[in-house]
Amino acid sequence: MNKQKIGFFIAAALATAAAAAAEPQAESAAAEPAELPLIVVTGSSIPTTPDAVAVPVETLTAAQLEASGVGSNALEILRKEIPAFQGRSNAGTSNANNNNQNTAGGSQVQLRNLPTLVLVNGRRVATSGIGAVNGKNFVDVNQIPAAAIDHVEVLTDGASSIYGSDAVGGVVNFILKSDYRGLATGARAASGADYGEWSAFATGGTPVGAGHITATLNYSHTDPLFQSDRSFSSPLYGKTSNLPGTVSGAADILSAGISSPSAKNPTGVNATAPSLAALVANGTYMPTTPARVAAGFDISPYQTMLLKQDLASFTSSFDLPIADRHRLTLFGDAMVSQDRSWTKWAPVAATGNTVPVDAPYNPLTTAFPGVTFSYLPNPHDFYDTVTATRITAGLRGEISHDWTWESALVYSESDLQQQQTNLIYKPNLALAIAGGFNAAGQPVAGGPFSDVHTGYSLNGPLALQPALDPFATAAGLVPGSLANLYGTEVINAVSQLESWDGKIVGRLGKLPAGEVGLALGATVRRELLSGHTDPNGRVTDPVTGAFGVNSQYWIGGTFADPFAAHRTISGAFVEVRVPLASEAWNIPVFRAFDLTAAERSEHYSDAGNSNVPKLGFRWQPFDQQLTLRGNYAKSFLAPNLYSEYGPTDTRQVGGAVIPNAFPGQGLPPEPFNGEDGNNPNLKPATSISRTIGFVLKPGFVRNLNLTADYSNIDLRGFQAGIGFNNILQSINTQGSASPYFANLAIGSFPGQAGASNPFGTPGTLLTYLKGGLANAANLYVIDRFQNNAELIEKSWTVGAFYSIATAHAGTFELGTTGSVFDSFTFLDLPLPGHTFIQYAGNATNAGVFGGTLPKWHFYTTLVWSSNDLHLEVANSYLSAVTDTGANGVSPPLPVSRYSAFDLRAAYDWGKLTMAMGVNNVTNRMPPLAPRTFSDNNADIATYSPIGRLLYATVTVKL
């Protein structure tokens, strides 16, 4: 990063503030500063005053959440207000056609594209159930409606020494409303081109003795957005050639105006054409290529870009003193939500079908291979229902004047049911094509009826229905022939978290510079993850375990064997804050200096032990105008249960892998046997983070606040797959010296009877593959998760805020916050030829942490307030990036910088508050990056595809 730009940013802010300070100020009576209350912020368990916080925490208030102009989705609010939330792991409603970032309608947040811990009221939440069927492992922040949030604390620093696993990039802590008095209801409606959203809420709270209870009801709806609704993603050609009317792998297609060969040729027992060439000669088919077929088909009307979503939620929190002695207090919270989402993909296609001779619609006198069947009016729909429940109950009290204690239990659960509709039931497809029955159900050669299974089960009764014409387009199909062919796969998954935590906090003693703070804590939690498809979605036979037998019957569906695993984690931490210099001493250069230290030890029943320390300082050299702070921390990321114990996927690996692994060797596409999935020997990934920064509040410019924090994080041993091509290349190059030599065998999978590995000498694997086409079919390769990857991040988080109150012209507030990436590099494997990929300033799909990472990303607001009127203009700015393609090294394409402006006006009548606004006033669409984001031509997560959005909100307080 050009550090001169950081200097320019600070200098410009100072100059602007100094100029503003020259304006006349409203007179205010001098007042003695009140004693600041003690608070506990995310990242520390020791209370401190707000001006003495040693960790970089950014707080978003409820007012800021509302002023963002975004609906109730926490991800979208955070991504807009805090630019550090960027990278493709910040996945949400824009995941509508991306199964690689499968969140089942949920929303994931990650600071600086790094693993980030999500808390509610300082405690953990169960991960999404989709993780049990090879989806993303994340906490769904969509279950936390904005209307229920009091504020959000975002710690941009490693914090495993306090919280344990996952806090590598930082922590996001959602603090729920807990002391609301009265009743408030509100609604929001928004509309844009081909898109709309609305939400409504009610929040009520009341004192209960010396305590209080608060509850919020919320409902929100967002419309789907189709690819065909936006010019940058429509028309969208070249995505698939698996279309109805194609045969021979899309080398031939039905001629224009012909919906089926039966319209022009005798079929079945009456067929006369001896070959496909004859059908080409008589004009039934015309030669083409897969590329030409794909180039003529616009897929955009068939796919959603943003999913449809309906979310209902209830949240509540309470704080009830139950005994004056020792200030014993009962506290807790509850969240219940149901999220229903829908997304649409292109219709499923069954490729490579061989139509038997004498089948009723076969136009040849022989079997007809290579036929593609698809029915375009039947899209592949996903209906996800996620029900989330979380309950916390605890007690807190005083041991003495200097010591307090707190203990709580948490139960959290995420239940997913996914229904994938319009999948093809494989056993019935062959029966439907073969026909062979008359209308009375009697076997007849070439009969136009089929006997198929009902209930999508081989044990279901047979039913007679019209035979299927697999050659036909939708217009040529016989009514009734699709019955019992298209069905729905049902997937269920559950994630559970049960935890207990306790801590004591107090003053260990007093040094000349002040009190020594100490916190001691312990936790025990149990995590459980389970998932299963219906019987037709299994990978293996439920009785014999054989691959592909009595299983994998949903064409286009999700395949997974039943899975269930759990683990227990116990941990303890200690944190201490030691003041070494006091402002009362008035020592030059050391007006105030505090050291903080923490360490946590955790034991995983499956992944062993982790011990992580943290050291930090807070230093005020002269006075409160300048505060310097820094931290050194170790963190860790435990492997998720699915990566360790999830079902393995044994399959035929596509033929493209071998020629890609050995380019220029003339090897044809050759499929081989592959197995990928879990690895029970995974260990936690580890990281080292270093942060240093400052807070500047210059006395010569009142109400100016500048912050800058530099972060350097080195994450090692991240869990990722090896890649079949990497395994083959490594063994061929290094022979038995390859770290993956044990992952390959012939005859059977490594470790099984009949398996052997004759490739100990470099080069012998390539020689073997060149020896004959059948040799690849005898290869058995295991690609499982490994602790291989490394990531190094270097970035700045900067901010500036300035306010000026005038005597007659109201109050002006100018604020900006930004994320500036110096470097973000990723190494997938420690192998020859593998180098670090640079993500910063690029858009790429390479590796695990792909996506768009602009070097400069800022969000700036200017607010004018006069009495009860508030006007705001906001700008989101992202610097230009380079589209480097799917592998990170393609010839680059420039992606233009992005800037969008928002306007908002609000008026508060006391009991009634109304606001109107326009997001993205100039209707700026996402800049094109077609190589990396081939599904939509642009990154629709980093850059919203909604365009101009008009909205209005109303809140009534009763």
Predicted regions and their residues:
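N-terminal Sec signal peptide and the immediately downstream disordered periplasmic leader
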Residues: 1-83, 205, 391
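C-terminal beta-signal and adjacent terminal beta-strands/loops
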Residues: 705, 714-716, 820-825, 874-884, ...
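Short strand-turn segments of transmembrane beta-barrel domains in outer membranes
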Residues: 153, 180-205, 297-307
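N-terminal periplasmic accessory domains that precede
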Residues: 75-77, 107, 140-142, 166-187, ...
